[in-house]
Amino acid sequence: MLDIKVIRENLDWAKEKLATRGIKPEQLDELVAIDAKRREAMVKCENLKAERNEVSKKIAAAKREKADASEAIANMREVGVKIKELDQEVDELQEKQEYILLRLPNFPADSDPIGPDESYNEEVRRWNEPTKFDYQPKAHWDLGTDLNILDWDAASKVSAARFVYYKGAGALLERAVYNFFLDENTSEGYTEVITPSLVNNDSMQGTGQFPKFTEDVYTIVDNDDPEVARNLTLIPTAEVPLVNYFRGDIIDGKNLPINVTALSPAFRSEAGSAGRDTRGLIRMHEFRKVEMVKVVKPEDSWKELENLTHNAEHLLQKLGLPYRVVALSTGDASFTSAKTYDLEVWMPAQDTYREISSCSNCTDFQARRAQIRYRDEDGKVKLTHTLNGSGLAVGRTVAAILENYQNEDGTVTVPEALRPYMHGMTKITPEVKWH
């Protein structure tokens, strides 16, 4: 959530910044007008409360002296009614103000490419050349089916479209990938955490998914009354429980930065993505992802964004997967992010790069929503900054391995970094079919 004081005192700047993220200036004018009314009502209310306190002392003194205080008492009853009305007005204006603030995205960093969509993203660097083949490479969904290690048909029968079964070497590969990620992340100083997969609305609001993106997730509904939600949502990413672990806390500044990592299932409704990536592992309703989260001091967050991105790149490099780093435009960056680097892995069958990780600096945006603070060396309490990044999306990594390490005979070579996690297996060959 943005700081209303920053908007109030820098309105033209705020309008210019948020215009690059699709926010109309009229929204900020409305917000500032509501804020002005709220502050005016607060001042009136505080003045009346101060007056009531002073008069109450005089009434008490008059009673001690057995003097008539009936007129003052009657006046104070009227003042009490006005105070109650003003308190209610302040609450209503505060609610309206918060309604708007909760739906405004983070201010973009000055270094962000300016543009309304992904076509304005800027490539920062590449690692390794795209994998070349002397033959037409197969798509990972064809490889997975031919090797009998991925089964979308069975998953569609049991669940719905955009679900998959991993079998045999496919299941072993998936497990190898996320164990490799966790081992590498912890070796880089991250503490591994196992999180809940269901979170409450306060948590979803704290990290910025609610109230703006309620259609993108799955919420648990009471079976006895389908209209009544249980206030629990299946997590779209481990970022939600990892960041909200610190919600409402005041952290000792000596303990910052805090680096945590977690493997979790991720559940996405994929609302609005009909017809896109209908085949394969790229866009699923349920998948596994290893997440990295940093809670840091504000002065360290830009350095930590580079560290976070390096941590994600390190995983792709150890797997030998070609990728590029892209700085997202103001119109393509996530709602909570001030700056995002996407890591895009090369997918030979599609002849293009596809996102496999997003590394974002959310500055104090999530910390303000979730009230994550720290106490500095002078004892002053301040908001932290939070960062998050995929380290990495597991299914997409499996897809990239299948496509980049495929052989002409239809087998897939296992990357050297994963062989210790796959019982020494060097090549994935077709699994026996059950039917």
Curated annotation (Swiss-Prot):
GO cellular component annotations of the record: cytoplasm
Gene Ontology terms for molecular function: ATP binding; catalytic activity, acting on a protein; serine-tRNA ligase activity; transferase activity
Enzyme class at the top of the EC tree: ligase
Organism lineage: Bacteria, Bacillati, Bacillota, Bacilli, Lactobacillales
This protein's record includes keyword ATP-binding: yes
Name of the featured protein: Serine--tRNA ligase
Compartments, as annotated in UniProt: Cytoplasm
Residue sites binding ATP per the record: R268, S269, E270, E355, I356, S357, S358
Protein's organism: Lactobacillus delbrueckii subsp. bulgaricus (strain ATCC 11842 / DSM 20081 / BCRC 10696 / JCM 1002 / NBRC 13953 / NCIMB 11778 / NCTC 12712 / WDCM 00102 / Lb 14)
Gene3D superfamilies: Bira Bifunctional Protein, Domain 2 (3.30.930.10), Serine-tRNA synthetase, tRNA binding domain (1.10.287.40)
Underlying gene: serS
Binding site for L-serine: T237, A238, E239, E291, S390
Biological role stated in the UniProt entry: Catalyzes the attachment of serine to tRNA(Ser). Is also able to aminoacylate tRNA(Sec) with serine, to form the misacylated tRNA L-seryl-tRNA(Sec), which will be further converted into selenocysteinyl-tRNA(Sec).
Keywords, ordered alphabetically: Aminoacyl-tRNA synthetase, ATP-binding, Cytoplasm, Ligase, Nucleotide-binding, Protein biosynthesis
